[in-house]
């Protein structure tokens, strides 16, 4: 008994003695606001396990710089870039190398530097040319980070690396050791906003305003994980399709904590809010009871008018729908639907009518709507009877503007936003080898897109095709500087597409219709490249003016 007590005390002392630094990278280009949830979630998980020296350094905070980070990591025992996106690799690469150099100055180069988040997908090519990053944490981190931290506290991290869940690295034999952390089946005890420093210009969402126009302090929460569908362009397409839910008790507790901190709005950052009808209604009721206005995401084919009315009655003021495209052949190429080929074909041809009906019902229900399209997708080639898929080809400009016209005229949305198809490692579109539906628009053809495509140093080292940076692509959501995108588009096509959408919006306003608002990169607005008048009508600068941004 005495031996066991002594061992427990020793472990407790070790846990309390180590310093863990969680780093959140800044996101250069954004159309939507939102917080890096990995920082508070992982910090909460570590706190619950007894770790008390955990720093959250979010580089999106205006009061933090990389110099502050370099100062804080000098006595750290574990450093983790948390919740990183693949698009952030240039920043991760730059900052991690500076951190390693700083540790070297103090003889502490053996301190593990880890990277977590979607940036770890297909990361072997970066790992092979980045010796200062110790390992990459693949999969959900709430439980695996505790095992990693325990190993660091015991002083056995390097010996235990092959056994630690989700840890990927180049081993002593020069092979890439690959593993993924198991799904977290219960996240009720985690405070998703633990120690979060609120950054209004990054976290508050302009879809949440008071009646007098005042911006509401916005929090993000997730109440479920997992998606039953496998849309190929989405990085959820290679994850588990089992949906895990947050308990009502935990949800209420966290909302009450947020209310005490002055929050008034909540964005539920989940894949399909209405995937389970009863759960969606209960969460709406709880949000209403706790005094929040809120919004979320769902699928066109997973909501009806009765649900919409119920959500609106319970303070829902925004629902995002990923329409992606209206052409049935595009839905088939993107694996939008589950089931047999015959079933998928039927669902694809029924989809446009569903889109129109749902948006009409949203307008009737008073639920603000968002119409989202992806440009440059592939489409299926069907046989004359439309019963078999014969192959795939790129969509055309005409295909895309037809989808826009359908959206503006048939759906009359409150918001309209675009994305150029980008290939994110971890999605079927990026990962699938061979002549898949995406090969006809993928810059690598039949080869997969890896994390290295997003890092200039890796692009140069491996000779990957280089994405040509074009300022006009910033008219679309989330297209950043180093990012492989569809070969189906070019700058003129993107510019012409956005111009066409603006013309339709302006024409609708002139005809007495409501304004549809585009989600536009704030930098473009600040530069005066895109303007909107008091009526909501748009004007855009000539394409040449986008060349140097």
Which residues make up each language-model segment?
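Radical SAM enzyme core and accessory elements
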Residues: 1-23, 47, 51-53, 68-78, ...
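Acidic, low-complexity intrinsically disordered segments
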Residues: 2-254
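Flexible glycine/acidic-rich beta-alpha junction loops that bind and position SAM and/or redox cofactors
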Residues: 29-30, 123-125, 229, 277-278, ...
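A structural motif corresponding to the C-terminal end of an alpha-helix
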Residues: 48-52, 106-107, 261, 354-369, ...
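Short acidic/polar active-site loop segments enriched in Thr and Asp
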Residues: 52, 77, 264-266, 317, ...
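Structural recognition of alpha->loop->beta junctions
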Residues: 126-147, 310-320, 386-420
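Radical SAM [4Fe-4S] cluster-binding motif and immediate context
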Residues: 188, 192-372, 377, 384-394
